[in-house]
Amino acid sequence: MRSRSAATLLLGAGLKNVYSMDGGIRAWQGMVAHGQPEAGMAYFTPAANFEEIVGLAWALEEGSKLFYQGVSENFSNDKEIHTMFGWLVSAEKNHEKHLLETYESLTGEKPDFTKLRSKFTSMDESVMEGGIPVKEALAWVKDKDVSESLELAIAMEVNALDLYIKMSRSIEDEKAQHIFKKLSEEEQTHLEKLAALLDKKL
């Protein structure tokens, strides 16, 4: 990872074989998520209630799904990478399904994502986990190799894991706590699989 704090986060979440890069973020030459460490939480700050929080989490999962789908297509000639990102697309779809069902059970209606996005000037386009616009991320990976694309995916998943852990601890609603705890556990699984594949490709 690019920093000791990120490495500490992953170790605290139960991941093994975590390393910190010499030089930290200043030595990193790849793409980075926008904003400060609390930036992910900021997406949810204007949300008036739990229903909006669930809807916004869905929007971030949708953005990640679109990104993984694009990367999978980019590496269609690499069976392992194509399969991995295809699996991540399915995983994000499952997250969306769970969040959508939760939203509908709470409100009795489908979420209006256009209305939700209008509350956030930074979400006037598809944004994925980590706060990165999907179009920007897909443009970045076009001329990158497998390892760089995997590293970006890992950075995204670290952001998502951090965000969902914070949400599960900061929300009082027990249903919300359960949802975000479950999501954080699944993001940890994503991280483990991506890290294992990156080790294999290096």
Question: What is the meaning of each model-derived region?
Answer:
Residues 1-202:
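Non-heme di-metal
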